[in-house]
Amino acid sequence: MKKIAVDAMGGDYAPQAIVEGVNQALSDFSDIEVQLYGDEAKIKQYLTATERVSIIHTDEKIDSDDEPTRAIRNKKNASMVLAAKAVKDGEADAVLSAGNTGALLAAGFFIVGRIKNIDRPGLMSTLPTVDGKGFDMLDLGANAENTAQHLHQYAVLGSFYAKNVRGIAQPRVGLLNNGTESSKGDPLRKETYELLAADESLNFIGNVEARDLMNGVADVVVADGFTGNAVLKSIEGTAMGIMGLLKTAITGGGLRAKLGALLLKDSLRGLKKQLNYSDVGGAVLFGVKAPVVKTHGSSDAKAVYSTIRQIRTMLETDVVAQTAREFSGE
């Protein structure tokens, strides 16, 4: 049985969206058990599942504006902290939260703990591409600064995830840069390029540019945390902008535009789904001793369900243990 500790109080629509996502996951997956951490009375308002689920009551939670490290240290009974401690103590196999991203990263670093020989765990998510397959990118902001060695480790981590969780036999690994030529970039990018090119275990395809990411140029894209986070926000903003422009064009375009939208309803719905990368799950803090997964703060029940499905796959394929063995040299 796969045991997942869930912070029921994190996120914009908690606990309703969290609990409703859990209800659906428990209905569909008979091999998971969920531990819900949070206000018992509020959780019970939405909990319909009766088997393989437990509630661990706490009145304390971490707010979105709390300073991450201080919150983890001072709010010992916060729902997120208790969920992370359950993983550390072996009572759960993974932790999920839609709450404060920085606090969850701190919980992953300081409570769950790093895998031996991994210097800086990175935040990774599967982002959308025009062909619907998506690409994995890290680091998306777990670290403000990185070395070439860190980026090399991210390439290995991302490749492991793409193989074992997404089922890509030979993931194409690209280094995000300001040009595709091998000589491009600052000293960090140049040194990283040399390390990736020398690693025969990677299917390294060279430098990739930001404009090509959504065209599916690579399966795994490596970046430092600052750059990766900027690209993530750019993709999110572009997706919202496209949908906003379409909505404005339809509502302001008169009867013809509305009739056209009606005819294209299924296509427009498909486009919206394609741009909504939360359907594939949450962002993984990769490089810690168990799956620590952050679903978007505005996640609905469907996104929570997708993230639980993602965690289930990670546990099924034992990707964290495989990663630990790889980095320990076993």
Curated annotation (Swiss-Prot):
Disulfide bonds: none annotated. Transmembrane segments: none annotated. Keywords: Cytoplasm, Lipid biosynthesis, Lipid metabolism, Phospholipid biosynthesis, Phospholipid metabolism, Transferase. Its EC number is 2.3.1.274. It catalyses: a fatty acyl-[ACP] + phosphate = an acyl phosphate + holo-[ACP]; hexadecanoyl-[ACP] + phosphate = hexadecanoyl phosphate + holo-[ACP]. Magnesium ions lead to a slight increase in the catalytic activity. It comes from the Bacteria. The keyword Acetylation does not apply. GO terms for cellular component: cytoplasm. InterPro entries: FA_synthesis (IPR003664), Phospholipid_synth_PlsX-like (IPR012281). It is found in: Cytoplasm. The keyword Lipid biosynthesis applies. One of its GO terms (biological process) is phospholipid biosynthetic process. Pathway: Lipid metabolism; phospholipid metabolism. It is an enzyme of class 2 (transferase). GO terms for molecular function: phosphate:acyl-[acyl carrier protein] acyltransferase activity. Homodimer. Probably interacts with PlsY. Belongs to the PlsX family. Catalyzes the reversible formation of acyl-phosphate (acyl-PO(4)) from acyl-[acyl-carrier-protein] (acyl-ACP). This enzyme utilizes acyl-ACP as fatty acyl donor, but not acyl-CoA. It is active with both saturated and unsaturated acyl-ACP. PANTHER family: FATTY ACID/PHOSPHOLIPID SYNTHESIS PROTEIN PLSX (PTHR30100), PHOSPHATE ACYLTRANSFERASE (PTHR30100:SF1). This is Phosphate acyltransferase. It comes from Streptococcus pneumoniae (strain ATCC BAA-255 / R6).
